């Protein structure tokens, strides 16, 4: 298990740290202990390696703290990424036997609050910070529901039922609505308005689409539209407010998709497992702008920063600069 720091301008490796795990759990499917994405506050970087736990480094590669979490992981391992919110480091820790939503102190890794999950707990979704307009909430798909939690205490505020075990996509939000999708059976996507308490399944769901439109990738909300992607390269664009399907197209790159779409400069970027990058206009009418091949297996979601898009394949890290 490795943590590597690169110079964003040159690609030079600045430092590399090995995390020596006594045991690396076997995982099924396409998962691995290094699936979760690191997160940074600009001073430190926080990484999660499944059953090994959390590790924090400063930007010079010095270990600040580590937090064992041996109870995390299940048949398919862990895939949830850590998230920062104020002084909190949030993590969805689930397993076949049990699990919890953890809020740790960014400075020390110590627990600030810990909310146990009800059975069945297995979930691969990452916590999502939702600004409702009346305050922020932590949203997570777990235990057959999408749930909202108080970030100060971890107390459950509301829930929407009907979600299966093992959901992978992370929620998204825009225009005052929250979007949550299921990639298992039953497969669907819902839009939820804020303000509810308790079970709001019948009161706060604004629209619902009952056909499967996502696989592993999370939905993307941008420019008044919601984009969803499933295996086979089938992409769906919704009107984010009404749920109307504006278009559904099969991209030139078929096959499986694990990376979530990202947006920048009015475009949506999607990457197939085979490393085919499709660039789509973030518009109410389908527009295929370009298709490029990395020629390498790609599971990680792209990242956009400083006018560049960073793509991690199984073999390499690429930085692609936009036109000036």
What are these regions (language model features)?
Residues 1-324:
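Noncatalytic, solvent-exposed loop/strand surfaces
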């Amino acid at each position: 298990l490795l943590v590597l720091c690169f110079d964003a301008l040159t690609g030079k490796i600045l430092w590399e740290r090995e995390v020596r795990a006594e045991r690396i759990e076997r995982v099924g499917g396409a998962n691995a202990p290094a699936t979760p994405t690191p997160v940074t506050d600009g001073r430190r970087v926080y990484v999660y390696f499944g059953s090994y736990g959390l590790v924090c480094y400063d930007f010079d590669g010095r270990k600040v703290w580590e937090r064992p979490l041996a109870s995390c992981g299940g048949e398919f391992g862990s895939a949830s990424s850590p998230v920062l919110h104020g002084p909190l480091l949030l993590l969805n820790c689930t397993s076949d036997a049990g699990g919890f939503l953890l809020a740790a102190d960014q400075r020390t890794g110590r627990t600030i609050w810990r909310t146990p999950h009800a059975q069945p707990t297995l979930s691969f979704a990452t916590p999502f910070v939702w600004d409702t307009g009346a305050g922020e909430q932590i949203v997570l798909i777990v235990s057959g529901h999408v749930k909202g939690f108080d970030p100060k205490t971890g107390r459950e505020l509301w829930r929407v039922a009907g979600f299966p075990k093992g959901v992978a996509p992370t929620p998204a939000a825009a225009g005052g609505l929250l979007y949550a999708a299921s990639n298992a059976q039953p497969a669907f996507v819902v839009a939820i308005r804020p303000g509810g308490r308790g079970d709001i399944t019948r009161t706060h769901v604004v629209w619902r689409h009952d056909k499967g439109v996502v696989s592993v990738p999370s939905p993307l909300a941008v420019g008044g539209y919601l984009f969803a992607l499933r295996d086979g390269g089938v992409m769906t664009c919704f009107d984010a407010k009404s749920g109307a399907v504006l278009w559904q197209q099969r991209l030139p790159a078929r096959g499986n998709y694990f990376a979530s779409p990202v947006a920048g400069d009015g475009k949506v970027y999607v990457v197939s497992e085979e490393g085919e990058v499709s660039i789509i206009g973030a518009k109410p009418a389908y527009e295929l702008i370009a298709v490029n091949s990395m020629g390498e297996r790609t599971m990680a979601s792209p990242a956009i920063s400083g006018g560049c898009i960073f793509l991690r394949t199984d073999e390499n890290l690429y930085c692609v600069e936009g036109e000036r």
